Amino acid sequence: MKDTIRQLIQQALTQLVTDGVLPEGLSPAIQVENARDKTHGDFASNIAMMLAKPAGMKPRDLAEKLIAALPASADISKAEIAGPGFLNFFQNTDALANRLDAALADAHLGARKAGPAQKVVIDMSAPNLAKEMHVGHLRSTIIGDSVARVLEFLGDQVIRQNHVGDWGTQFGMLLAYLEENPITSDELSDLENFYRAAKKRFDESEEFATRARGLVVKLQAGDPDCMALWTRFKDISLSHCQKTYELLNVKLTMADVMGESAYNADLANVVADLKAKGLLVEDQGAQCVFLEEFKNSEGEPLPVIVQKADGGYLYATTDLAAVRYRSNVLKADRALYFVDQRQALHFNQVFEVARRAGFVGHPMQMEHMGFGTMNGADGRPFKTRDGGTVKLIDLLTEAKERAYALVKEKNPSLAEDELRHIGEVVGIGAVKYADLSKHRTSDYSFNFELMLNFEGNTAPYLLYAYTRVAGVFRKLGKGFDEVEGHIVLQAAHEQDLAARLAQFGEILNNVADKGTPHVLCTYLYDLAGLFSSFYENCPILAAETPEQQQSRLRLAALTGRTLKQGLELLGLETLERM
């Protein structure tokens, strides 16, 4: 609806330019927002106040001319002026009802991408394979997954890329230890202990350290035996990651792995091409690119080091190779990097170097989707009681157990297998939703008690809200798609629910554009609250007429489908009963 209103305003502006009321050459960003006070309309725009000065008119006078020039629209019942010159628009409830009827018949609930479909690379998760996944990997994994789901739902072609850390000097140490201690995948169930044992051996034995360094050289040279050992370790580590992804209900597979090692063959070419472009400067033996727009506190340009003095390559080199691959081989239109916001400088530098070097041959928009940290109750990065790293799998297991105990306390008569299933859905969903409901760039404190609460903006509340809608149809023995008739909006609670349902597509486009799943979380929470008010004030099963019952059932069905689809786009499973 906002796009419709923007188009109407644009047509009115064009008419006023033709009439000589407005000067030519204006290209304002037309803003349309939801009205704060429904008595003054459903949507509002400040366009008259934005253009009053160039028009040489008072805002209200320009607003009057804009309203007079607005084309007629079946979607808008009337437009009015409020305050100093706001334009307020009232939706036509019949047109709104028709849109919702159409959405109910549509697999995508009426949601369509605002612009043309694109090919989008999502760089997400990226654990270090030398160690087990820890809580620090949660945000990149689930935020990236949710945005990828939304983009696909809206029609984009999404290429997930798990840029795992599978290369570097640490692997020489690990391979040397694995060579000494050949163990199976099951035996290597604790990568943290394996890493610590290898590090202890490295620190205490000069012979072991020398052999480890030798394995790094052999690995980099492509020695077959060394590569076989490295591949075995990598596969074992990736299998651990995959178990975590499956528990998280994240759409990442082995086929999505595109680790650091995948770009090894191109790193020398990256350096050579930067040199050919005249971008390289040698500084203390290292090969660097200096960009004037990135300076230190003394005002000196910061280096982007692409090759160390000893000939080794760095993260920037690998990331430049990845940019070139994603642009020129994958032909991506967008590349979204879901990486800690503390890496903002690094990515801004890499993106600029890539542009200057001509590595972005196919026009590709590069966006660092940075995120804040997950902290403990003390406001510091989440750690174990002894200060160690919290394994992600341990956190998720505890969430399942806590949710299981909570559900069992409330429903002791349920079968054990059902209790376990509900506990897993609620527990994993609670962890994910608590994270996704926070603004991507904000830090937040992890709190099991809050996230497992059945009140407030939590996963348990929304999962229960969905079961409440599903329960209405279970009593009738019908599915969401088995309700006939048409939606008729009469009561205020019906209209409020309908207006929010109609915003689903707009919300998804916002998430797709900005990479902010919390917007979808807020929408679903609002929708659940509006349905609760509707359900309490607009009887469904005890409706006054069959037509009214059908209309309200259709509103309930669309609410149920929207809640289910929205939760699925967040990567949360739903339950038919709790």
UniProtKB/Swiss-Prot annotation:
Top enzyme class: ligase
Pfam families, sorted: Arg_tRNA_synt_N (PF03485), DALR_1 (PF05746), tRNA-synt_1d (PF00750)
Protein localization: Cytoplasm
EC code(s) of this entry: 6.1.1.19
Chloroplast is among the record's keywords: no
Signal peptide bounds: none
Catalytic activity: tRNA(Arg) + L-arginine + ATP = L-arginyl-tRNA(Arg) + AMP + diphosphate
CDD domains: ArgRS_core
Cellular component terms per the entry's GO annotation: cytoplasm
Major location category of this protein: cytoplasm
Segments carrying motif 'HIGH' region: 127-137
Keyword hit for tRNA-binding: no
A single MF term (Gene Ontology): arginine-tRNA ligase activity
InterPro entries documented for this protein: aa-tRNA-synth_I_CS, Arg-tRNA-ligase, Arg-tRNA-synth_N, Arg-tRNA-synth_N_sf, ArgRS_core, DALR_anticod-bd, Rossmann-like_a/b/a_fold, tRNAsynth_Ia_anticodon-bd
Record keywords, A-Z: Aminoacyl-tRNA synthetase, ATP-binding, Cytoplasm, Ligase, Nucleotide-binding, Protein biosynthesis
One GO biological process term: arginyl-tRNA aminoacylation
Intrachain S-S bonds: none
Family per similarity comment: Belongs to the class-I aminoacyl-tRNA synthetase family.
Subunit structure: Monomer.
Entry protein name: Arginine--tRNA ligase
Organism expressing this protein natively: Pseudomonas putida (strain W619)
